[in-house]
């Protein structure tokens, strides 16, 4: 059971393109489940890095990691070809998403940009399958095995990174007492620093600036980690447009009431 489920394509995307999200909602006492859509079994140290990053930003629960391989592609078709090299199909890619929604019953699901941020095929496949999963996860005729195991379930909301409709802008630059005065974005920077193998990539300068000049999430304009669109809702559209939990009551609060 999770208030928020984030399906990150790779082991550092949760700290990069979703920078600020995990520490922000962790600081608010949310139950958060992180899922990784690819498994870096060809570079096993990244599994350790992802755990160190999650613990740094306040996540309490172990993630779920799929068995889908990680290879670069630029299209959904290309991504499907990469997972096919290990015997997986489009149906498997969709079924995994449906299973995660039914298993963890998130009130809010969060997905990658439909265009894959910088164009990565696995980001695109992840987002496309999440969209379809939200549409069918409440129907027991789809993937009946997981329907029988977990029951059917439809999230109350789906937010898609950079989606152009029903836009919200998150504030990750306000200091948090939960993190000793650091902002959620600053915590994600510390989380990304745990990904030692990725410090020589262009992602570091994208997040920090070439000379460390980026100190706020709001300074990042390309693939902004602050911008999302509400793709699906069963609890009404957002009015304040700055909080994924607008119109949502945390599971813990529901139990208290």
State what each model feature region is.
Residues 1-7, 90-257:
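Metal-dependent de-N-acetylase/amidase catalytic core
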Residues 1-143, 257:
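Active-site beta-strand->loop->alpha-helix modules in alpha/beta enzyme cores, enriched
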């Amino acid at each position: 059971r999770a208030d928020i489920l984030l399906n990150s394509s790779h082991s550092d995307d949760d700290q990069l393109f979703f920078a600020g999200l995990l520490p922000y909602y962790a600081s608010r006492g949310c139950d958060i489940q992180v899922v990784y859509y690819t498994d870096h079994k060809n570079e096993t140290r990244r599994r350790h890095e992802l755990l160190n990053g999650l613990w740094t930003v306040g996540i309490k629960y172990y993630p779920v990691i799929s068995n889908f391989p990680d290879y670069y592609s630029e299209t959904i078709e290309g991504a499907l070809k990469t997972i096919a090299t290990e015997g997986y199909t489009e149906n498997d890619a969709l079924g995994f998403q449906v299973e995660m929604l039914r298993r963890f019953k998130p009130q809010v699901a969060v997905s990658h940009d439909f265009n894959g941020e910088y164009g990565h095929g696995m980001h695109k496949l992840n987002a496309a399958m999440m969209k379809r999963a939200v549409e069918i996860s409440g129907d027991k005729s789809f993937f009946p095995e997981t329907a029988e195991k977990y029951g059917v379930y439809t999230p109350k909301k789906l937010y898609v990174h950079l989606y152009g409709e029903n836009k919200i802008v998150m504030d990750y630059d306000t200091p948090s007492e939960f993190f000793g005065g650091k902002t959620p974005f600053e915590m994600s920077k510390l989380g990304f620093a745990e990904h030692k193998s990725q410090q020589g990539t262009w992602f570091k300068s994208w997040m920090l600036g070439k000379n460390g000049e980026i100190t706020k999430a709001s300074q990042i304009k390309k693939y902004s980690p602050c911008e999302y669109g509400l793709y699906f809702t069963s609890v009404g559209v957002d009015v304040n447009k700055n909080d994924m939990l607008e119109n949502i009551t945390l599971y813990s609060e529901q139990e208290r009431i």
